[in-house]
C-alpha cells in the first residue's frame, strides 16, 4: 500500500465524506465540475452539511504540492491536477430520466474524464449505483477506447458501491461495512486492502464486479418494497379505522418482525435504483412485477396524503379554496438539506390543484434551491402571524420537536402527521 495517490471524482453527498476519510491517511485530489462547490470546499464550507467545518478544514490542504507529498485533501475542477493520481474513485450520481429509465450520462462522462488522465498501472473504482453489468459493459469500453489502454494489462477496475446515509451522523462512511470487487484477482485484493485501511467496520470482498453491483441495487430495492408493503397496509387500515402505527408496534413485539414504517419514498437512491434493476431484467425478457408494483405504490403516496388532508378539512366544515395550508419539511428525508426527488412536492402540487394556498417551511433546505428546482418560495419563519387551516408534518426534522402548533393553527385546523412524529393526541390523523 505504498505510493497511493487518490482522486475522488464527484464531491457530493457520497464523494466528499469518502475523500475526507481517505485524506486522513493518503494524498487525495478531489475533482468536481462545479467550480463554486470546489471553492466553498477549499474554504471549509460543505453545503450538504455532511462534513463539519472543523472536520473539513482539518484535512483541506491549500497547497497542491503538500497534498501530493503528504496526506490531505486538495479540491479542484481542473483535470490536469488529477493526472498525478493512481487510484481514481468515481462517485457521480446515477439518476433516471423523465420516463424512469436509467440515465448513465454522468457515469459515462466521468469515464471519459478518467480515460483522458489515467496511465499504465492505474486503478479506477466505481461507487455509483448501477444495474449488474454496467461497469463492464458501459464504462470500461469507454475508458479503453479513449485511453487506448487495455483492462487488466494496462489498468485495473473495481466496483465498491456507496453506502452513505445522508444526514446520519452515527452511521458514517467508516462505520459501514464496504463491499469491494475487482476486474481480476490481484486488483480485487488491492482494492479491498485500500478500503480496509480506512473502513473500521471492515470489508466484504465480492467474487465479481457484477455481484457487487447486484448487491447494492437489491439493498435499495428491498427497502423500497418493504416500505411499499407498509404503505399499502396504511391504506387498508385507514379504511378499517385502525391506527397503522399501533399495529406495527404490536407486530414489532415479535423478534423477527421487520421494523418498517409508512411514508414518502424520495431521494436519489431508494426511489430511483429499483428502475435500474427493472430495466436490466426487461433486457433479459423478464418483467419484474414486485419491484415495479412497489415503485408505483410508493409514488402514489403524496397524492394519497393530500386527498386525506382535503377530506379531513371538509369533515371539519372547512371550505377548501384559498385556505392557508402549511407543509412542515420539504427535503427528501429528515435532518438533511437534500431536496433531490423529494416526494413532498407531490403533496404540494395536489393541494395546489385543490385550490389551497400552500406554504412550505423547512429549516434545513436552501430556499434558493427550492425556488430554482421547484419554483416554490418557502417561508423563512413561523412567527404566528399567519394561521393555517391544515398543517402537514411531512419531514421529521429535529427542529420540529418543540414546535408549538397552537401558535399557527387557525380555527378548525387539522393536523396530519406523515411521519408519526408528533404525539398521537395532538394530530387529527397520521399515515
Regions found by a protein language model. Give the residues of each.
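Structural/interface elements that position substrates and couple domains in central-metabolism enzymes
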Residues: 1-431
Amino acid at each position: 500500500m505504498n505510493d497511493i495517490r487518490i482522486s475522488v471524482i464527484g464531491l457530493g453527498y457520497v464523494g466528499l465524506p469518502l475523500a475526507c476519510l481517505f485524506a486522513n491517511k493518503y494524498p487525495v485530489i478531489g475533482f468536481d465540475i462545479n467550480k463554486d462547490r470546489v471553492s466553498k470546499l477549499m474554504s471549509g464550507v460543505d453545503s450538504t452539511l455532511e462534513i463539519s467545518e472543523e472536520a473539513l478544514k482539518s484535512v483541506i490542504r491549500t497547497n497542491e504540492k503538500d497534498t501530493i507529498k503528504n496526506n490531505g485533501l486538495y479540491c479542484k475542477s481542473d483535470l490536469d491536477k488529477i493526472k498525478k493520481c493512481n487510484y481514481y474513485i468515481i462517485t457521480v450520481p446515477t439518476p433516471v430520466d423523465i420516463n424512469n429509465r436509467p440515465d448513465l450520462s454522468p457515469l459515462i462522462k466521468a469515464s471519459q474524464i478518467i480515460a483522458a488522465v489515467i496511465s499504465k498501472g492505474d486503478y479506477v473504482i466505481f461507487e455509483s449505483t448501477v444495474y449488474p453489468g454496467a461497469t463492464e459493459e458501459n464504462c470500461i469500453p469507454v475508458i479503453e477506447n479513449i485511453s487506448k489502454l487495455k483492462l487488466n494489462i494496462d489498468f485495473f477496475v473495481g466496483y465498491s458501491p456507496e453506502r452513505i446515509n445522508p444526514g446520519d451522523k452515527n452511521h458514517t462512511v467508516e462505520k459501514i461495512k464496504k463491499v469491494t470487487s475487482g476486474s481480476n484477482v490481484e486488483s480485487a485484493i488491492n482494492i479491498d486492502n485500500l478500503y480496509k485501511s480506512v473502513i473500521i467496520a471492515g470489508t466484504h470482498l465480492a467474487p465479481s464486479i457484477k455481484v457487487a453491483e447486484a448487491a447494492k441495487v437489491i439493498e435499495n430495492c428491498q427497502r423500497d418494497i418493504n416500505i411499499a408493503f407498509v404503505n399499502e397496509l396504511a391504506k387498508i387500515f385507514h379504511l378499517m379505522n385502525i391506527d397503522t402505527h399501533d399495529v406495527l408496534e404490536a407486530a414489532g413485539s415479535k423478534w423477527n418482525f421487520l421494523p418498517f414504517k409508512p411514508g414518502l419514498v424520495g431521494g436519489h437512491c431508494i426511489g430511483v435504483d429499483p428502475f435500474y434493476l427493472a430495466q436490466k431484467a426487461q433486457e433479459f425478457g423478464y418483467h419484474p412485477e414486485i419491484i415495479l408494483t412497489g415503485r408505483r405504490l410508493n409514488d402514489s403516496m403524496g397524492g394519497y396524503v393530500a386527498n386525506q388532508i382535503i377530506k379531513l378539512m371538509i369533515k371539519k366544515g372547512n371550505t377548501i379554496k384559498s385556505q392557508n395550508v402549511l407543509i412542515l419539511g420539504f427535503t427528501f428525508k429528515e435532518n438533511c438539506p437534500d431536496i433531490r426527488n423529494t416526494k413532498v412536492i407531490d403533496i404540494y402540487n395536489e393541494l395546489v390543484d385543490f385550490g389551497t394556498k400552500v406554504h412550505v417551511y423547512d429549516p434545513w433546505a436552501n430556499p434558493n434551491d427550492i425556488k430554482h428546482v421547484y419554483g416554490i418560495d418557502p417561508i423563512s419563519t413561523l412567527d404566528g402571524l399567519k394561521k393555517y387551516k391544515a398543517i402537514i408534518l411531512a419531514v421529521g426534522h429535529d427542529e420540529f420537536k418543540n414546535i408549538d402548533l397552537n401558535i399557527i393553527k387557525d380555527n378548525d385546523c387539522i393536523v396530519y402527521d406523515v411521519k408519526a412524529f408528533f404525539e398521537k393526541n395532538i394530530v387529527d390523523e397520521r399515515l
